[in-house]
Amino acid sequence: MAREKFERNKPHVNIGTIGHVDHGKTTLTAAITNVLAKKGQAQAQDYGDIDGAPEERERGITINTAHVEYETAERHYAHVDCPGHADYVKNMITGAAQMDGAILVCAATDGPMAQTKEHILLAKQVGVPALVVALNKCDMVDDEEIIELVEMEIRELLDSYDFPGDDIPIVQVSGLKALEGDSTWESKIEELMTAVDASIPEPEREIDKPFLMAVEDVFSITGRGTVATGRIERGKVKVGEEVEIVGIRDTRLTTVTGVEMFRKLLDEGMAGDNVGLLLRGVQKEDIERGMVLVKKGSITPHTKFEGEVYVLKKEEGGRHTPFFAGYRPQFYIRTTDVTGQITAFTADDGANVEMVMPGDRIKMTGELICPVAIEQGMRFAIREGGRTIGAGVVSKIIE
């Protein structure tokens, strides 16, 4: 049987469910697919299908993630749900599932709990742009005042992490009742999806952002000059445009005199293209792997940053022993290893710790020996002699 073609007739958005353990994320995910399946916009999945998600390996880290897809009248969604708390954290830090927005699930019976807060913070740090709240298990709370109090508490919590608490929609739902086919609660799931359609913005396409290409290889063509190759991460670049070479050494300006892809000449290269860019007046030794070519003035190199890091366990190929402040690994950023130092760290909840064990999650301050184009929300790996021992995301640029 021939595979059916993916129809691109609606905008595609990646979302996920986040929130405290046992607040009903997986049940709600199942309910969404069941309610939309009745309109022919999804394949109905039950709790077991989603909860029994197979393990995935992303950069050598084992993550349990369930992927479901469904449509609303407006959009096509890919939705991730992770059964375990540790899986969420790994997922968000490694970028295994990039989210354009998330449904924060909070049980009306409990109100916000520890992981509710932690997931909101993580969403902020890894750059999830928008949230919608599903206040779940509302069928179990008779008192309207309790629900109002929980809503206020959630809004204050969102505000404290710089999300617009007053504007984020909070929809009262019961994933379980909707799954059982109760029509009142089914309509609440539809209301939730209408809020998701309206409040989670369509992602800005990479092509509309300022040009950036990480240099993977450099060679010189006799009589023509120096060519840098790589995959364009975002934006587009035209022949004749000025670009900056950023990172490792002082930033310098050059002009793109040719764009080639698969040995063919192009007028412009765009996000996703693997290209060779011919650069005017640049010697082969002036540019190396690990530098980036960017739209003039769009990015500055940095050496000091804060990051959220997951340190691999021994079984995941990580270290067998702990490390201490002052540890000097390589940071693999975009296309190259840069030596640096982890000057300070705390546990992920801010508690002071003396050492970092394999399997830990930490907040760290890193300092690189030379400036590189690092940006907030960017992923990096921590390596030692060529093997990955940690995965992280830049939460803040210091200098």
UniProtKB/Swiss-Prot annotation:
Mg(2+) binds at residue 26. Residues 81-84 are annotated as: G3. The gene is tuf. Residues 174-176 are annotated as: G5. It is an enzyme of class 3 (hydrolase). CDD domains: EF_Tu (cd01884), EFTU_II (cd03697), EFTU_III (cd03707). Residues 136-139 are annotated as: G4. This is Elongation factor Tu. It is found in: Cytoplasm. Belongs to the TRAFAC class translation factor GTPase superfamily. Classic translation factor GTPase family. EF-Tu/EF-1A subfamily. Its main location: cytoplasm. It catalyses: GTP + H2O = GDP + phosphate + H(+). GTP hydrolase that promotes the GTP-dependent binding of aminoacyl-tRNA to the A-site of ribosomes during protein biosynthesis. Residues 10-204 form the tr-type G domain. GTP binds at residues 19-26, 81-85, 136-139. Keywords: Cytoplasm, Elongation factor, GTP-binding, Hydrolase, Magnesium, Metal-binding, Nucleotide-binding, Protein biosynthesis. GO terms for cellular component: cytosol. Monomer. One of its GO terms (molecular function) is translation elongation factor activity. It comes from Prochlorococcus marinus subsp. pastoris (strain CCMP1986 / NIES-2087 / MED4). SUPFAM superfamilies: EF-Tu/eEF-1alpha/eIF2-gamma C-terminal domain (SSF50465), P-loop containing nucleoside triphosphate hydrolases (SSF52540), Translation proteins (SSF50447). InterPro entries: EF-Tu_GTP-bd, EF-Tu_GTPase, EFTu-like_2, EFTU_2, G_TR_CS, P-loop_NTPase, Small_GTP-bd, T_Tr_GTP-bd_dom. PANTHER family: ELONGATION FACTOR TU, MITOCHONDRIAL (PTHR43721:SF22), ELONGATION FACTOR TU-RELATED (PTHR43721). Pfam families: GTP_EFTU (PF00009), GTP_EFTU_D2 (PF03144), GTP_EFTU_D3 (PF03143).
